[in-house]
Amino acid sequence: MEKGKRIVHIVLIGLAYGYLGYKIATYDNYAGLAMQFRQAEWWQYVCLAVSVLLFPVNRLCEAWKWRFLVRGIEPMNMWEAQRQVYYGTIAGFVTPYKLGEYPGRAMLFKQTGQHWLTATCMGMIGGYAMTTVIVVFGLPAAIWWLKPDGSLLWSVALALMSATIAIFALPELMRHLRKRTWKSEQTRLLIDTMADLNYHDVAVLLGISLVRYAVFSLQLLLTLLFCGVKLDALSMTVCLPLYYLLITVTPNVPAAEVAVRGAWAVAIFERFGADISAAAVIATLVLWAINTILPLIVGSLVAYKRK
């Protein structure tokens, strides 16, 4: 690995751990967190353990998607795909809106250059696929949340229609935009990359994103149970997709990420009582630690290894 890259890696890792230390030092609800751990029963610890065990499955799904996206740029095995995904977590952790995540992954390519920018565009496409799945499930949940007596069948039909549009309209739209002249080289490259996708590619990306969505939704459910949030099945079915929808569409920077997650947890769960909303806030913190701090640690350990 070139000296320049090594310096960048060291700086990124240093910034990530420095920021992590800041977040830990400034968190102001350790008393509630400690109380939850003291009061939890054995089955709640089982829920927490399963949620932690699902964290590598979560990242494996993302690595699967990343490997699929860049297969035409730099073929790699699953180990290398996971290594790049974990390292991208570090770069995303220290940049606004996680803008550095995909360029960070591409930094570990054997050859960079134009491939680096193309890979970044492909990563953005993977992010759009994940956002599509979150919206498809979150939109009906939002409708049901705002109007519980509305038609659930209509909400589901809206979700299916959105999924169909996402699958069949995106490639055709990009092919149309490709005919225009773009001043920005990055914009032109992104449109060209998306225009080269076929319907099978889009369906695969949405399928992988759906699997990952199921995994981190299960993680949230298990973490909520660990923290003592017990709701009926319908309420959980609505609250989980709604939560992920809201944190996805809310612009935020790393310094405010935990606060944004906690604020939306309060907004969603407060109708079930103050105790439930307080427990939900703790659950979002625990899940943030599982899916952000653990990948950060793994990423710093595997950054320099190439198999």
Q: At which residue positions do the language-model features occur?
A:
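Transmembrane alpha-helix interface/packing and boundary motifs in multi-pass membrane proteins
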Residues: 91-95, 241-262
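Predominantly cytoplasmic-facing regulatory/coupling regions of multi-pass membrane proteins
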Residues: 1-85, 142-250, 282-284, 288-307
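Re-entrant/interfacial helical elements at transmembrane boundaries that shape
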Residues: 101-110, 253-270
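Membrane-embedded alpha-helical segments of transport systems
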Residues: 90-96, 117-141, 246, 283-297
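Membrane-interface alpha-helices at helix entry/exit sites of multi-pass transporters
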Residues: 79-83, 101, 112-127, 274-286
